């Protein structure tokens, strides 16, 4: 993992098209601004974990026989 120090209004660039800027620092919270192409999904880590869990749950509840019947049509 790369660890960088930044101050308010400073930024980092990732892959020429993603810019992360430090907008505000209050105590132990840091507010980030992220500029990226619309094709790049951006999630908070805890939200992304919930999405993955939901996808796994949805995939595991599908009956294989039902899927096979759908694809035969």
From Swiss-Prot:
Listed InterPro entries: CsrA, CsrA_sf
Protein purpose: A translational regulator that binds mRNA to regulate translation initiation and/or mRNA stability. Usually binds in the 5'-UTR at or near the Shine-Dalgarno sequence preventing ribosome-binding, thus repressing translation. Its main target seems to be the major flagellin gene, while its function is anatagonized by FliW.
Sorted UniProt keywords: Bacterial flagellum biogenesis, Cytoplasm, Repressor, RNA-binding, Translation regulation
Keyword Nucleotidyltransferase among record annotations: no
Organism the protein comes from: Lachnospira eligens (strain ATCC 27750 / DSM 3376 / VPI C15-48 / C15-B4)
Any Gene Ontology biological process: regulation of bacterial-type flagellum assembly
Gene3D superfamilies linked to this entry: Translational regulator CsrA
Protein name as catalogued: Translational regulator CsrA
Gene name for this UniProt entry: csrA
Subcellular location(s) of the protein: Cytoplasm
Subunit structure comment from the entry: Homodimer; the beta-strands of each monomer intercalate to form a hydrophobic core, while the alpha-helices form wings that extend away from the core.
Gene Ontology cellular-component terms listed: cytosol
NCBIfam families assigned to the protein according to its UniProt record, in alphabetical order: csrA, PRK01712.1
A GO molecular-function descriptor: mRNA 5'-UTR binding
Membership in a protein family: Belongs to the CsrA/RsmA family.
């Amino acid at each position: 993992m790369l660890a960088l120090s930044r101050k308010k209004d400073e930024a980092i660039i990732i892959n020429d098209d993603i810019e992360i800027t430090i907008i505000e620092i209050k105590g132990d919270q840091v507010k980030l601004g992220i500029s990226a192409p619309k094709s790049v999904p951006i999630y908070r880590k805890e939200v992304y974990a919930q999405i993955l869990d939901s996808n796994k749950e949805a995939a595991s509840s599908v009956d294989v026989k039902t899927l096979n019947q759908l694809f035969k049509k």
